[in-house]
UniProtKB/Swiss-Prot annotation:
Gene symbol of the encoding locus: CYP88A37
PROSITE patterns, sorted: CYTOCHROME_P450
GO terms under biological process: pollen tube development
Organism the protein comes from: Citrus sinensis (Sweet orange)
Catalytic activity, reaction form: luvungin A + reduced [NADPH--hemoprotein reductase] + O2 = (1S)-1-hydroxy-luvungin A + oxidized [NADPH--hemoprotein reductase] + H2O + H(+)
Protein name (Swiss-Prot/TrEMBL): (1S)-1-hydroxy-luvungin A synthase CYP88A37
Length: 491
């Protein structure tokens, strides 16, 4: 009996000792390492904790995004440290500060002097390979401005309406002709990819577009990989291989466009042609590796946002019949006012889609394709009285901003009417980022979405096969069945 109690006491002592070591010592290693070196300034850091050695809080972050409540990660910070809107943390392999207070978000976005792009290691390794990354800040800014000029503003994007309409009308007609349900999101991605490839590449065969789309899926899964390990079996390794394959596919396209230019062949210019022409402040042009990397990035962002937001908007509309009816009536009114001689949409008509714009804004707020905008402090910075050390990442946490009840009451409810007479506080609506580095394709994406929904509401309905299908949030929010549905035309 005494032996039994001795073993019991020993086991209990080992358990208590292990617990004390794990949570009293091991759990604080990250905190001691990253914050201890700051001396007295560590007391001016935002509230929070640095998680476990090496992995930080990445496991709890991933757990939240694999659940039905991805915003639970930021809600947990609210509960533990109050609604201060700024927290220290350690995710994506780096010490960081998570920002959700609108005023702080605005400061980070507008301060180009103290904050640069600060993508996770996985994104940097997959995205930047050529000389562009070594150019000066002003050189990068100039190249980015020139390269993205065809994508910004109604005057620039109006030239794409006819092309978008053609692909939208043909796609919807084809889907409606099928007797069996389709993975609507998958088909939407194919359609928007055709649109973006046509705009960016000038023109390209279906085989090229299909090959790029095929390898893009593996590439996208590795962009924000929590553990960028380049070994077989890891998503980052598959993404690296996919990136190389994308380069092999796009290089011949680049060579072809260059040959057409040297032979003075006429052809509609795409972004690829513009990227071949731009120069930095020293007159240096982008090398092929830079051009291919930029094309992959633009192709990636350009079709993902349009396809997913249009799909989620239609899902929300079909789950809210009154909202659907109101959105449809607006589109019908636009058609009724149209001259009999006019064929197709005009930019003026798209500007009249005020209610649809609210539907799209609400879908953007709820979906959050990118959970964060990534920056890095280039100097010691003060944000709302808190110290941000040089070299730390700063994550403007979009989902935390958009699901904060202080910014949007009842944030889980789809409610386009919340945008009626709504004055958006700077930094409180940031689906495309903000500041000088705001997503250059935002206007083009909203144009695509508007045209898709316009033609869909007028001519089709969506019969969801699994109306209560749960959502998945990695790598981006989507229905787990890819929105399995029938597209039914009105007779």
């Amino acid at each position: 009996m005494e032996l039994y109690f001795s073993w019991l006491i020993l086991a209990l002592a080992i358990f208590i000792g292990t617990y004390a070591f794990v949570f009293g010592v091991l759990r604080r290693v990250n905190e001691w390492y990253h914050c201890g070196k700051l001396g007295e300034m560590k007391h001016s850091l935002p509230p929070g904790d640095m998680g476990w050695p090496l992995v930080g809080n990445m496991l709890s972050h991933q757990k939240a995004f694999k659940s039905s409540e991805p915003q639970s990660f930021i809600y947990n910070l609210f509960e533990r440290y109050g609604r201060k809107g700024i927290y220290r943390n350690h995710i994506f392999g780096s010490p960081c500060v998570i920002v959700v207070a609108p005023e702080a978000c605005k400061q980070v976005f507008l301060d180009d002097e103290n904050f640069k792009m600060g993508y996770p290691t996985s994104t940097n390794k997959l995205t930047f390979r050529g000389s562009f990354i070594t150019a000066s800040k002003e050189g990068q800014k100039r190249i980015r401005k020139l390269a993205t000029s065809p994508l910004k503003g109604h005057k620039a994007i109006v030239v794409y309406i006819d092309n978008i309409e053609e692909i939208v009308i043909k796609s919807l007609k084809g889907w409606a002709s099928l007797d069996t349900p389709i993975e609507f999101l998958t088909e939407m991605r194919k359609a928007t990819f055709k649109i973006i490839a046509n705009i960016f590449l000038g023109s390209s065969s279906d085989s090229v577009i299909g090959s790029v789309e095929k390898h893009y899926i593996d590439y996208a899964h590795g962009l924000i990989s929590p553990f960028p390990i380049n070994l077989p079996g890891f998503s980052f390794h598959k993404a690296m291989k996919a990136r190389d394959m994308l380069g092999e596919i796009l290089q011949p396209v680049l060579n072809e466009r260059r040959a057409m230019k040297s032979d003075e062949q006429k052809g509609r210019k795409g972004l690829i042609d513009l990227l071949m022409e731009v120069e930095d402040e020293n007159g240096t042009k982008l090398d092929d590796l830079d051009i291919i990397d930029m094309l992959i990035s633009f192709l990636s962002a350009g079709h993902e946002s349009s396809a997913h937001i249009a799909t989620w908007a239609l899902i929300h509309l079909h789950k809210h019949p009154q909202t659907l009816r109101k959105a449809k009536e607006e589109q019908e009114d636009i058609i009724k006012k149209r001259p009999s001689t006019q064929k197709g949409l005009t930019i003026e008509e798209i500007k009249q889609m005020e209610y649809l714009a609210k539907v799209i804004a609400e879908t953007l707020r709820m979906t959050n394709l990118s959970p964060s905008s990534f920056r890095e402090a280039e100097a010691d910075v003060n944000i709302q009285g808190y110290f941000i050390p040089k070299g730390w990442k700063v994550l403007v946490y979009n989902r935390g901003v958009h699901y904060n009840p202080e910014n949007y009451p009842d944030p889980k409810q789809f409610d386009p009417s919340r945008w009626d007479n709504h004055t958006t506080r700077p930094g409180s609506f940031i689906p495309f980022g903000g500041g000088s580095r705001i997503c250059p394709g935002a206007d083009l994406a909203k144009l695509e979405i508007s045209i898709f929904i316009h033609y869909f509401l007028l001519n089709y309905k969506l019969e969801l096969q699994n109306p209560e299908c749960p959502a998945e949030y990695l790598p981006v929010p989507r229905p787990s069945d890819q929105c399995l549905a029938k597209v039914v035309g009105f007779k």
